[in-house]
UniProtKB/Swiss-Prot annotation:
Part of the Tol-Pal system, which plays a role in outer membrane invagination during cell division and is important for maintaining outer membrane integrity. The lineage of its organism: Bacteria, Pseudomonadati, Pseudomonadota, Gammaproteobacteria, Vibrionales. GO terms for biological process: cell division; protein import. This is Tol-Pal system protein TolB. InterPro entries: 6-blade_b-propeller_TolB-like (IPR011042), PD40 (IPR011659), Tol-Pal_TolB (IPR014167), TolB_N (IPR007195). It comes from Vibrio cholerae serotype O1 (strain ATCC 39315 / El Tor Inaba N16961).
């Protein structure tokens, strides 16, 4: 029974779906009222032609989508300063804004764009009115401008304007939260378009759905994309030869390599944190079992054994253990196995089933699909205390994938009878949805930092 359930879940998780040519668009659905107000002032541009990207709009959208910030709409801004010297601290303080990003864009002789930008601490500026002073190296009393959190300049080609906007959002996010931003990342997913001669498609896009690119198309199912730690390779499952086989593909060169083609099932590939080993699931000896493969030698090591079905391996961030889903207790639950000694322990006890587990990059939390009376929902479990929190109220949640900074989780769910990708913050307070038009998009895999 569990074997059939695993196969069904794998099919659900692959993303048998289609999407419109337009980019996926994130829509905040919950938690915006408690987000932190911030001002992303439109960057000054006096060129004769239109900019290739609205940099400030991309930054504002990124920060809003994190769920932690609520950018002030341009129409409600009391002023639009283009440098920190023009900021009226009192006007922004009265709106509850404590941070402001401002900047200018010019074009150089080579056609590239010079972006100058500053992040301003409004609270500090209000206290000092921008007149805080400090001793210089030669003993002179000079303006310290300690209300300016950072002041940066970059020269960017037109083709990379949107990419650099994500970079600025990362810098703002890290400065204000102390955590690394994950806006300059990608997602991989599987799409199906029944009207296409090659209906099964593996695609990648920026985390927000822009710059979507077709990586691979096939007449047979594609499943379970997984990123290498360097962000250059995807492992995935293909049925192009009539059975499940595991492949590895460089997303830049397109070079593909078959890794396994054992009888019956080959699936659920997952790179180790150092990229040297692949965890995978094979059924060549009967039931589904977890293995590891040394990618240099192709040597296989069996990790689990016995009469139970064991699947969905995921590496602990330290690379010393794996978590996996097993029916050894009767119903699917999540276990952890030490790779050096083989000791195995059960991690999940709440809910009739727990599947698709992933561990946050800091090793503190387990995120999984929990089945209870309310259905299949994402849940988070504290690995030290065992305390569990239901993160979502969406329908038929599956395939969670954690952002590399651990701040958000992307997953598949049902909305208005359609399959969509959704996001939830790791604390469950903020939720967003990536609606798909005329189809379904599933099996997201969030890339590492790029």
């Amino acid at each position: 029974m569990f074997k059939r359930l695993v196969f069904v879940l794998m099919l659900i998780g692959t993303g048998f779906s289609n999407i419109a040519n337009a980019a996926l668009e994130l829509v905040i659905t919950d938690g915006i009222d408690s987000a932190r107000p911030i001002a992303i002032v439109p960057f000054k541009w006096e060129g004769a032609t239109k900019l290739p990207e609205d940099v400030s709009a991309v930054i504002a959208s990124d920060l809003q989508r994190s769920g932690k910030f609520s950018p002030v709409p341009t129409s409600k801004m009391p002023q639009t300063p283009y440098s920190e010297e023009q900021v009226n601290f009192g006007k922004w303080t009265s709106m509850g804004v404590d941070s402001l990003l401002t900047g200018t864009i010019t074009q150089n002789a080579e056609g590239s764009y010079v972006i100058s930008y500053q992040l301003v601490d409004i609270v500090r500026g209000q206290l000092t009115q921008g007149q805080s002073k400090a001793l210089s190296q030669d003993g002179q009393l000079v303006l310290s401008k300690d209300h300016v959190l950072f002041n940066k300049v970059a020269t960017v080609p037109a083709s990379r304007m949107r990419e650099y906007a994500h970079r600025i959002a990362d810098l703002v996010y890290e400065e204000l939260t102390g955590e690394r931003g994950a806006f300059l990342t990608r997602i991989a997913y599987v799409v199906v378009n029944d009207k296409d001669p090659y209906p099964y498609q593996l695609r990648i896009a920026d985390y927000d759905g822009y710059n979507e690119r077709l990586v691979l198309r096939s007449k047979q199912p594609l499943m379970s994309p997984a990123w290498s730690p360097d962000g250059q390779t995807l492992a995935y499952v293909s049925f192009q030869n009539g059975q499940a086989e595991i492949y590895m593909m460089n997303i830049y060169s397109g070079k593909r390599e078959k890794l396994t083609s054992f009888p019956r099932h080959n699936g659920a590939p997952r790179f180790s944190p150092d990229g040297k080993t692949l965890a995978l699931v094979l059924s060549k000896t009967g039931n589904l079992q977890v293995y590891t493969m040394d990618l240099a030698t192709r040597r296989l090591t069996e990790v689990t054994s016995g009469r139970s079905n064991n699947t969905e391996p995921f590496w602990h961030p330290d690379g010393k253990s794996l978590i996996f889903t097993s029916d050894r207790g009767g119903k699917p639950q999540i276990y952890q196995v030490n790779l050096s000694g083989g000791e195995t322990k059960r991690l999940t006890w709440q809910g009739s089933q727990n599947l698709g587990g992933q561990i946050t990059p800091d090793g503190k939390f387990l995120v999984m699909v929990n089945r209870s009376d309310s259905g299949f929902n994402l849940a988070k479990q504290d690995l030290e205390t065992g305390a569990m929190q239901i993160l979502t109220k969406t329908l038929l949640d599956e395939s969670p994938s954690i952002a590399p900074n651990g701040g958000m989780v992307i997953y598949s769910s049902i909305y208005n009878k359609a399959n969509v990708l959704s996001m939830v913050s790791i604390d469950g307070r903020f939720k967003a949805r990536l609606p798909a038009t005329n189809g379904r998009v599933r099996a997201p895999a969030w890339s590492p930092f790029l």
